[in-house]
């Protein structure tokens, strides 16, 4: 059965680089050390995951559709260090050195590309493993899709979602629609925090059911808040939901692992 390993490239690289940058190295030395650690990490992932296909997905220099509909999207995030951004080509080469192809789009966010890749292979009954610390991918969890937090050595699975949020993976988008995601500067419903969001979704099941309930005369205080800020909740829902239908322009044969000899490609 095919097993696709998807590496959230910048999520991995930025954390590896941050460790080196704390070692009082020069920027050039930190980049060299990051490259060496990236190769070592990549080889560990390939050995441990035993994939039949693999790809590393990068964010490009894009002005995403989310920024178009919500200009404050991701405002306030710490920018990538200049020396790291300027050295991304050599880090991309490090993936290729390990036999891992890289995907970089100038029109789509890496998160949406990863969601499309994982969902596409899952629809055909095959498996996908996403390497990332980004909990946003937990909305994709199903028997065919798993998420591995390499740095904390844990699986971000349904049990993790239940423990962390008190909901099932299919409810996460609606959970974040209510609470917002501070790391992406996405606002939810003022006055509805994680505990209340969990209680509401455990009782009503979904945001659509909550929106129907909040129109009732006997609506509770949290539901009245939702009624007042329902447009914000719907916008947040749209922003946090990953796209799963982006045209990719390549097929699985092109990202086989180990790579096919050029004569067979």
From Swiss-Prot:
Entry superkingdom: Bacteria
Entry keywords, A to Z: DNA-binding, Endonuclease, Hydrolase, Magnesium, Metal-binding, Nuclease, Potassium
Pfam families registered for this protein in UniProt: 5_3_exonuc, 5_3_exonuc_N
Molecular function terms, GO-annotated: 5'-3' exonuclease activity; 5'-flap endonuclease activity; DNA binding; magnesium ion binding; potassium ion binding
Binding site for Mg(2+): 111
Cross-referenced InterPro entries: 5-3_exonucl_a-hlix_arch_N (IPR020046), 5-3_exonuclease (IPR002421), 5-3_exonuclease_C_sf (IPR036279), DNA_polI_H3TH (IPR020045), FEN (IPR038969), HhH2 (IPR008918), PIN-like_dom_sf (IPR029060), Xni (IPR022895)
Enzyme superclass (EC): hydrolase
One Gene Ontology term from the biological process aspect of the record: DNA replication, Okazaki fragment processing
Enzyme nomenclature, EC number: 3.1.-.-
Span of domain 5'-3' exonuclease: 167-260
Family matches, as CDD domains: H3TH_53EXO, PIN_53EXO
Region (Interaction with DNA): 191-196
Residues that, per the record, bind K(+): 178, 189, 192
Cofactor(s) of this protein: Mg(2+); K(+)
Classification via SUPFAM superfamilies: 5' to 3' exonuclease, C-terminal subdomain, PIN domain-like
Co-factor note (free text): Binds 2 Mg(2+) per subunit. Only one magnesium ion has a direct interaction with the protein, the other interactions are indirect. Binds 1 K(+) per subunit. The potassium ion strongly increases the affinity for DNA.
UniProt similarity note: Belongs to the Xni family.
Function comment: Has flap endonuclease activity. During DNA replication, flap endonucleases cleave the 5'-overhanging flap structure that is generated by displacement synthesis when DNA polymerase encounters the 5'-end of a downstream Okazaki fragment.
Protein name from the UniProt record: Flap endonuclease Xni
